[in-house]
Amino acid sequence: MSISRRAVLATAAAALPAVTLLGSVHDAVAAPGTTYYIAEDGDDQAAGTSESTPWQSVNKVVTAINAGQIVRGDTIVFKRGQTFYGQFTDLSGLQGEGRITFGAYGSGEKPRIMGYKVLNKPEAWKNIGGNQWQIELVEGNYSGNTSTEDANVGFLLLDSAFHGVKKFSVGELRNDLEFHSDERNRMLTVWSEANPSTRGDLRITVNGRIFQAVSNMTIQDLDLIGCGGHGIQVRDVTGVEVLRNRIRHIGGSVLYGTTRYGNGVEVYLGGSDVLVEDNIIHDVYDVATTIQGHQILKTGGEAPVLRLGSSNVHFRKNYITRCSQSFEIWVAGPEDRSQADTTSAKAGIRTCSFTDNHCEDAGIGSWGQEVRPNPDEGGVHLLSYGEGLPIELSITGNQFIKAKNAYMYRSPEHRSSISIDRNVIQLAAGQKLQQQRSETIEQHAAWSQATGFDANSTFTVAG
């Protein structure tokens, strides 16, 4: 993303009074436990418990959690205006009781937590013939995020420009900066006339999450950048707050086969009591925000916990732009297609909402939309693939401004009780409201009558 586009984003977000770009009074306040400070000029051998003795790295924080030094009730704060590489993919070793908080201290811009691996070593590349260059993604061949050895690359970023065309064999590479990643052998191959690392600031994302949330967790006032999987995933945990963060440059890694994925904030079925508020989310391969997932009705093996549904999940006052979709909902029974539980009081999605969010440019200027194999399912604000479980969800008070394809993608046969109303919808003249239906924005009254959606919403045609 160029500097000018970054400025445009900041200006647009600043126009929204509900969204806080730079925190000050909202910074992490010391909890009853210990506060740990992280700064670029810190020392991982220091105490870490004061601004004058900060630690330096994400890896130190992860190590301290696994060693039982950082426990529940503690607060971890990163210095504003500074950059830290790594990710918090596995916090399962966290001990104790109470809330764990990740936040910021000092003044200036939000601290940047980057998942990028930086490919700044030309000597690490090997030309394997023609314009094909290969690098082994092993220690010593890159800098930046060393928290993971994953080699499932999501996209390349060269001098702030996205390059997301991923091929599934080396032989398919034909054009500049197309790439193939071999996860098993940890090998990345890139089509380039010159050594890729000599062309500028080259970075890659790899699979994972910047934060895999745990129960009773607050993530606030951070700038989370660069991951091939999700920005934040909430799965089988409760009591999670995601507040006033910026989440960007997310997705593109392979989920299975040739299917790529990656969401800004994903609440997977089983996550409950979640608040996602006042965040800025942009440049995501798939969807900015979502509640989704399969039930687990029998435990064992890779299914250690029962999973019936999610409740009390709320997305509000977020600013979303340049994602393939803004909000997605789908829920289903077990993956083995056995009988779903639709009668339990905890089944499906209960008492959830998507309210007062400002969503614009769905699929417009979106790197993910440009490279996805199913573009008709992107470029929409609202997306629903399946509604096989009970859904109690309200989508109200939002602004949905401009989309590449349509306002929503939803199968007409779905009949769950989703309440969608009192929104502002702005599309281009002649643009469809729903991909699977014929009504255009000019025919919104007929569409609302047929679907039951947005009867009291405001529809405008973009000038």
Describe the function of each predicted region:
Residues 29-32:
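Low-complexity, acidic Ser/Thr/Pro-rich repeat tracts that form intrinsically disordered stalk/linker regions
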Residues 401-405, 409-412, 418-439:
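Leucine-rich solenoid repeat modules
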